[in-house]
Amino acid sequence: GLGDVYKRQTIAITSVYYFIAARIILGIGEAGNFPAAIKVTAEYFPKKDRAFSTSIFNAGSTIGALIAPLCIPTLARYFQRMGVGNGWEMAFIVIGGLGFIWMGLWIFMYKKPDENPHVNAAELAYIEQDKDNEEDKKATTPTTKDEKSISFLQCFKYPQTWAVFFGKFMTDGVWWFFLFWAPAYISDVYGFSSDTPTAQMLIFVLYAITMLSVYGGKLPTIIINKTGKNPYAARMQAMFIFALFPLLALFAQPLGNKEVFGEQAYWFPIIIIGIAGAAHQSWSANIYSVVGDMFPKSTIAAIVGIGGMAGGIS
């Protein structure tokens, strides 16, 4: 909601200070998206499937990064040809309006599984399968068996909260570094301006590779089905595997040397960085899902929000 207000009010920005204020509103509005999404995932999926479902919607940000550079300029040029301002104002209005429609759908259509008439008995039984699974009631949870609610300040009393905090603090910077540094790297090292077809193709391939993270979210489910491990242990094993892949980024610059590997050596760092980014997103999907293993559903959004704050600080 607040994010959509930002998009629409951007057309009224006439100074840097207004822009900063608008960005603050956007940040406040965006901050609730992931905590809410993780909580919905915990309500609609059993523990073994949560990382996979999280990796799917987590990939949505990558899809948006691929589509936005194509859609927004096209909208702006269309409205400019129609004589509606400079074009970009209406682009903000259209995107903001779509956001309000999306918000309305969530407000009026979302219901918990046991209250949703579109969820049948078999689906509800699958969603609630963890209730009867004693193996999943591990000592890792900081709450009593009735899963009482925990206040926001009380969350900081538990070591599990700090594990999520430092996990996000130490890793989110990697993703944002790859995301924002890659275009500058392509421009500085290989001389491709961001508006050239080659640069756009490289960025497209980079983002497309990161979407492999969807399969990374499936790995814990595979481990559970093959080994019989509980979801928490399976996620820890998967996260360890994913944590090793970003080390490949150490080879990105040496393999991108044009003098050694030819004029098209730029494909090596692009592919390597894409794989590292996909591994990070897979790791991130699992740490979000771990929150649901350690805390009751009523507290998941707060813990994920704390982790998101840590990632933002990094």
What annotation goes with each model-predicted range?
Residues Y232-N286:
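C-terminal transmembrane helical hairpin of 12-TM major facilitator-type secondary transporters
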Residues F57-P113:
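Helix-loop-helix hairpin linking two adjacent transmembrane segments in secondary transporters
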Residues Y17-I25, F268-I275:
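Paired small-residue
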Residues Q154-V214, H280-S284, Y288:
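Extracytoplasmic gate region of multi-pass secondary transporters
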Residues A51-A76, L206-V214, G308-S314:
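Glycine-rich segments within core transmembrane alpha-helices of 12-TM secondary carriers
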Residues P113-F165, V189:
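Juxtamembrane intracellular "pre-TM" segments in multi-pass secondary transporters
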Residues A22-A59:
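Cytoplasmic helix-loop-helix junction between adjacent transmembrane helices
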Residues G1-Y6:
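Short, small-residue-biased leader/transition segments that mark boundaries at the very start
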